[in-house]
């Protein structure tokens, strides 16, 4: 009888749905100096495992990831896993002096987190000073085993990560800019997977080549890791189908060109031509420019090569490929905001049964922040002049006119230990203290205030945030990245946001869900998110120059009442300041 009962129970257990448990993945990343040559210029740069860009990391939805980061360089270091929610694991998020003190020379730290409810293309990068110029790599999250993509399985998946190459040391560049108050020097080239390509001098051998077969579909995982530039990207004589943005599936649409801001990722399907075309095709990217400062006005190119038919393979195939006609794509104009707007408007969440768009329909708190540039007075002694907008001012940037001052202690630890006094203020304004015509004639006083201010939210608060660009020192697009959350972009527009009219046009059905949004130049973006993740979460412009100038702030989400709504305790190896 007991045996029959046991068999019956066992049979019932077999009938229950079996959970797809994740596994634990271990990685070790050594941050070390490495000599790298590009554009006939060799320099010693900060690398990951001696590679530039860093190695591809792969996990599946549901996996626990333990990444030991060992610092073997003179610089302090921290790594951010861009787009990972870090549910209750804020200690692993990575921004220096926000969620952790940086890892000092000769020290190590294990980033320990579980990937919950996420799959797609993300990336990792250094999150201190300008070290992410060389410390970055793809972070690919595959769906759970047995869970298909919402599109046909591609023949092959290819990460393509855009970056910027500087002949000079980027730490010296931002250090000089900070001292003089001026704009930093721009990059010498853009790169695809670390390679500038043949349109630059002394660079033909450093070209990314994508070898494809006719009649196949390739999933290109595009990542913009550039420091300071949004990019247009196109493949000559080919269209692509956009299927994902910031690791969220979108309603598929075809396009010849994509726009991708720093911090953003975009997955596209490339269907190759049905037969061998007897040609090769440039894949090019160049900047989308809205600001008034200097920029790197150059173009990176990779080459799409078709595998030749079998009868032409052999010793001469590489030579024959070299002799093929090479087509170039036509990219939008550098300042083509019309294209940027149309592309942005096409992005919609898939909003299917399996991948719903859970937009907060009821909002607990509404915030209105300005984002833009400003000035600080010269801090030089001996009446030395600055190189900012005037010879008595330095460039600055702010959110709601508060230029964020980086603390010397980690904010998350200060909050967790109850020792926040003198480290940060919990009083970030809900809206600008001094309203003005944000996109009209700028005010005479362009000075910012400086402080370490946090916005405090009770657990599970539903938030609506409108971010408004300003015309101070010129309107400009700002890609804003929020750590710890995805958000829904429910509205965008140009001019000043109208709280009475504009919300009527909000998309609350299938808005794009992402972690980095471009606030339009001379316009605004409205986002909604649910503050269901306790911790301190950085929000900043992903143009590194603007972040350095202070266009950043942080949200403090308090613990909830239940045990699974509370921040986990700090790990034993958390770095000390």
Curated annotation (Swiss-Prot):
The molecular function GO annotations come to: copper ion binding; hydroquinone:oxygen oxidoreductase activity; oxidoreductase activity
Q: What Gene Ontology terms for biological process does this UniProt record contain? A: lignin biosynthetic process; lignin catabolic process; phenylpropanoid metabolic process
The glycosylation sites annotated in the UniProt record are: 35, 76, 112, 185, 201, 237, 297, 335, 383, 391, 401, 437, 444, 450, 460
**EC number annotated for this UniProt entry:** 1.10.3.2
Which residues are noted in the entry as Cu cation 2-binding? 82, 125, 542
Which UniProt keywords are listed?
Answer: Apoplast, Copper, Glycoprotein, Lignin degradation, Metal-binding, Oxidoreductase, Repeat, Secreted, Signal
Q: Where does Cu cation 1 bind?
A: 80, 481
Q: Where in the cell is it found?
A: Secreted, Extracellular space, Apoplast
Cofactors = Cu cation
Q: What is the residue range of the signal peptide feature?
A: 1-22
Q: Source organism's superkingdom?
A: Eukaryota
What is the reported tissue distribution? Ubiquitous with higher levels in the inflorescence stem.
Tell me the SUPFAM superfamilies matching this sequence: Cupredoxins (SSF49503)
**Which reaction(s) does the protein catalyse, per the Swiss-Prot or TrEMBL entry?**
4 hydroquinone + O2 = 4 benzosemiquinone + 2 H2O
Q: Where does Cu cation 3 bind?
A: 127, 483, 540
Free-text comment on the cofactor? Binds 4 Cu cations per monomer.
Segments forming domain Plastocyanin-like: 30-146, 156-309, 427-561
Q: InterPro entries attached here?
A: Cu-oxidase-like_N, Cu-oxidase_2nd, Cu-oxidase_C, Cu-oxidase_fam, Cu_oxidase_CS, Cu_oxidase_Cu_BS, Cupredoxin, CuRO_1_LCC
Principal subcellular localization: secreted
Positions annotated to bind Cu cation 4:
478, 541, 546
> For this UniProt entry, what's an example GO CC term?
plant-type cell wall
Record function comment: Lignin degradation and detoxification of lignin-derived products.
Regarding protein family, the annotation reads:
Belongs to the multicopper oxidase family.
Q: What is this protein called?
A: Laccase-17
According to its UniProt entry, this protein's organism is: Arabidopsis thaliana
Report the gene name: LAC17
